Amino acid sequence: MDSTLISTRPDEGTLSLSRARRAALGSFAGAVVDWYDFLLYGITAALVFNREFFPQVSPAMGTLAAFATFGVGFLFRPLGGVIFGHFGDRLGRKRMLMLTVWMMGIATALIGILPSFSTIGWWAPILLVTLRAIQGFAVGGEWGGAALLSVESAPKNKKAFYSSGVQVGYGVGLLLSTGLVSLISMMTTDEQFLSWGWRIPFLFSIVLVLGALWVRNGMEESAEFEQQQHYQAAAKKRIPVIEALLRHPGAFLKIIALRLCELLTMYIVTAFALNYSTQNMGLPRELFLNIGLLVGGLSCLTIPCFAWLADRFGRRRVYITGTLIGTLSAFPFFMALEAQSIFWIVFFSIMLANIAHDMVVCVQQPMFTEMFGASYRYSGAGVGYQVASVVGGGFTPFIAAALITYFAGNWHSVAIYLLAGCLISAMTALLMKDSQRA
């Protein structure tokens, strides 16, 4: 453990409360944009992309192809983490965070004007995959910078709460993306929605980008980063991601294991179940679109509340509680789907994608960033977080759809997949030492 770097912090009196608030607000605003854009793709892939961009294959294969393009974004997230992390550790967090918002917004808006397969043939899916890769690259650099700036700027005993805006941005992004798709879906016919209605939410991203850039322009670099740069100005530096790998190789594996619960609970409910419930169960698409609205809205309240509890009672306790709730809800969720019981579908969707998910993500910012020294923290935490996204989340809808296809529509294998991921996260958190309070 690099005790010298990790324990080196600016005096608490130098931490400006106004700087902390601006960092929290800026991290939140950018996270809204990035997660709105990133999640919007998953929702639309479940409803539209199989027919608009892959019409030449069977419905089942079209669904797999659409979810595969969803996973492409995750493959490029580690690369974004490496590149943005490298320059973020050298040049500063703020510069990189301005650039990630620009890249994400432009890629998303271009998807909104992308011609379909019937217009330009195979160029349509090729360009779709390219733009999805740019989305993944941009969001790969977003989390590390936003998490670090908010954690490093926060008061010592309120780091989970002040950095929770990064994850609240996820909830607002989910709320906006699902809400806008749901609204347009209700206002258009199926033909209109498939033709042009789905494009409107992608173009709306431009408005969010301009707002986020205005907010982020008022942020400052954290005092901790500035002090670290001063101390190491004359030192010979290795590439930050290499430094992180050499000093803390086990931290990357821990982050992957810890994130399984979060990734599986969210993407199975918001992406896979949306497709599975409509195509296999005959349930209306509005059901899971409305569930996404509910989950996103509740997350705006529950994430900061759980973060406050974590600051008060310990991060690990809150984390383990969330993973156990996810474990216990896996099979009941699919049983409710099979029974087509709306009340229990909604209830267990909230237990998985809201309660379990939010108890886990609310403490990830301080938990993950404190595994690394300040001079390579953007690279270490960012790359670890994004590699976990590939391993645990990027192909979750694809894997779940493949399991359903392989087992002829039987959902038990997907429930086991979800349960196992939650248990792995629980065991990893149980074996960790709470860096704040056990």
From Swiss-Prot:
It catalyses: shikimate(in) + H(+)(in) = shikimate(out) + H(+)(out). It is found in: Cell inner membrane. Gene3D superfamilies: MFS general substrate transporter like domains (1.20.1250.20). InterPro entries: MFS, MFS_dom, MFS_sugar_transport-like, MFS_trans_sf, MHS_symport, Sugar_transporter_CS. The keyword Transcription regulation does not apply. Involved in the uptake of shikimate, an intermediate in the aromatic amino acid biosynthetic pathway. Keywords: Cell inner membrane, Cell membrane, Membrane, Symport, Transmembrane, Transmembrane helix, Transport. The keyword Protein transport does not apply. This is Shikimate transporter. GO terms for biological process: shikimate transmembrane transport. It is a multi-pass membrane protein. SUPFAM superfamilies: MFS general substrate transporter. Induction: The translation of shiA mRNA is activated by the small RNA (sRNA) RyhB. In the presence of the RNA chaperone Hfq, shiA mRNA forms an inhibitory structure that blocks the translation initiation. However, when RyhB is expressed, it pairs with the 5'-untranslated region (5'-UTR) of the shiA mRNA to prevent the formation of this inhibitory structure, which allows translation to proceed and synthesis of the shikimate permease. Disruption phenotype: Disruption of the gene abolishes shikimate uptake. Belongs to the major facilitator superfamily. Metabolite:H+ Symporter (MHS) family (TC 2.A.1.6) family. The chain crosses the membrane at residues 28-48, 64-84, 109-129, 133-153, 168-188, 193-213, 255-275, 287-307, 318-337, 341-363, 387-407, 411-431. The lineage of its organism: Bacteria, Pseudomonadati, Pseudomonadota, Gammaproteobacteria, Enterobacterales. One of its GO terms (cellular component) is plasma membrane. Its main location: membrane. One of its GO terms (molecular function) is shikimate transmembrane transporter activity.
